[in-house]
Amino acid sequence: MSIRDSRTLGEWQDKTRVSPHIPYSLTHEDIFDNGGMANMANWDFTVMGERLANDERCAGPGLAAYFVKGVIDRDIPMHVGTCVEELVVDDGTVVGLRATRDGEDIYVKANRGVVIAVSSFERNVDYSRKLALQIEPRSMVMPSIKGAHLRLAGEAGAQIARVPDVSMLGFHIPGEEQEEGVPLWRGALPFMGLPHTIVVNHRGKRFANEAFYRSVYFGLDEIDGMTQSYKNFPCWIIMDRQGREKYPFGSVMPGDDFPDGVGVKAATLAELAAKIGVDAHGLAATVDTFNGYCETGEDRDFQRGTYPWGAMMCGDPKQKPNPNLGPVLKSPFYAVELHRMAGGGITSTGILIDEHCRAVGWDDKPIEGLYVAGNSAARLDNGALMQSGITNARGITHGYLAGRHAAGKPSGLLQQEVTRQSL
């Protein structure tokens, strides 16, 4: 990912968001060439400081700034503080929209169509419970992500589609907030697969490959038929003194004590189990087995550390023989309860689209003049290839396809792939 100097955005510099979740002043190469996420002490903080001072952005914020600059360079108007209230439909075709700004109605005519790209609905508690089956809706995303696409496109007759959503795990550090006082939730993804760390259920048992999020998140939805309860939730991340001294945990730096309200600490595993209500014998047996795997470098239960993704994203290249395996051995021990969250912007439920990213109506025909892109579109394009960055990739792809079709030059790339792969 290239670096974007956000000072070129002019008045839009402060209006273009940065992320509270990633070190956006470093590229992936900067991070992984210096020991990865697990070795913050090796990062080039001089470069980081210079880029922060110059507001040079990398990763997702850099990509966002790049697109904003593209809009500026093309003299395309942008408006903040403007809420789209409804689409204007004429004889089944979307021809414009009605918005409000400062309490006044604004009507915009669409010459070639309207594109809805307002992300998902994770900050809408009602939608998250009904559509994503979230028990206690929490999310990492910004507070404004409330599902406007479902309302707008739904009123125009668009279908809503879904496949089962994936739950994420996360935690909240008291005092960390987003705008409007909304609690800032952090994903546990970068920390679960670190050495000297495991994730266990109430029986004290591991239930997944902690270094690969798909393994963990699908394990969360397993039901115990005898008790009619979740087998692996609630769950806790367990670490020892080595893990706490070596690695960060959200905004808590290596070696720092957890703030009040974050986790518990105990001199022994038995004491830790008692404090969090986990089966002590189960936890002791799990840790003993796991520590044995750390000696051989082979996790015989869940193959942790065998996937390049896990080794790269939450592994420590200094840890031998397996970058994701380090024993949970040294006192004191720590436990932090992990909470279910929506998919970090990657919800499955959304507006059904066709190969040109047109919204599809309940008659299974495209709604002319209405396009949907990114997380506003139903995520039915799922599979093993879907890894980190998929939301950005989908948004870019949808925008390209919608733009080509609206311009009267529809792309045939998807149909070529369908033919090539005999789908």
Q: Can you say where each PLM-predicted feature lies in the sequence?
A:
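Short Gly/Pro-enriched turn/cap motifs at secondary-structure boundaries
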Residues: 142, 186-191, 213, 227, ...
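An anion/pyrophosphate-binding glycine-rich loop and adjacent beta-alpha core
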Residues: 1-39, 150-154, 159-282
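Glycine-rich loop(s) and the adjacent beta-strand/alpha-helix scaffold that form part
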Residues: 54-61, 73, 101-178, 224, ...
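A glycine-rich dinucleotide-binding beta-alpha-beta segment and adjacent secondary-structure elements
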Residues: 86, 93, 282-380
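Short acidic/His/Gly/Ser-rich catalytic and metal-binding motifs that mark active-site loops
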Residues: 122-127, 246-249, 379-382
